[in-house]
């Protein structure tokens, strides 16, 4: 379960597996710009997943990872206010065997985050009565108004 909290302003924290992931909106959108936006983290999750698959590919074959890099670029569709294309580029490590190039691309394309975009899960939303807020939570909520 991922739990969301509101530390102030437009910042939103998400707690997962003992970690707290901080997010904020850019200053241009009224936020403080103190952390990546949730959408930035969405793109980061794709890039990090692809990077993990590239790293694992090399390690499983005993290949050097020196110089291995993965980068992600997003092409926007301003008319629909969304991303139209995501490009993932892999800088192969030094001495990477040409015979593995296509296999590396296939491996990286199996990223589980990307696969969830290709076949998205169903979303369900619900709303329930709020639990009793602590005095600190009330104070924080009132100061944000």
Question: Where are the language model's segments positioned?
Answer:
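Alpha-helical metal-binding/catalytic segments enriched in His/Glu/Asp
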Residues: 49
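Extended beta-strand/beta-hairpin segments
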Residues: 1-44, 52-145
């Amino acid at each position: 379960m991922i739990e969301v909290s509101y530390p102030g302003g437009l910042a939103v924290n998400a707690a997962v597996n003992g970690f707290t992931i901080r997010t904020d909106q850019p200053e241009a959108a009224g936020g403080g710009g103190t952390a990546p936006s949730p959408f930035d983290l969405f793109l980061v999750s794709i890039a990090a997943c692809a990077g993990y698959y590239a790293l694992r590919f090399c390690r499983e074959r005993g290949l050097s990872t020196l110089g291995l890099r993965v980068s992600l670029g997003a092409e926007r569709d301003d008319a629909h206010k969304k991303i139209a294309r995501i490009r993932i580029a892999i800088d192969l490590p030094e001495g990477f065997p040409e015979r593995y190039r296509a296999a590396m691309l296939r491996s990286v394309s199996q990223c589980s985050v990307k696969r969830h975009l290709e076949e998205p899960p169903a979303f369900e939303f619900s709303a329930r009565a709020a639990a009793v807020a602590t005095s600190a939570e009330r104070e924080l909520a009132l100061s944000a108004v």
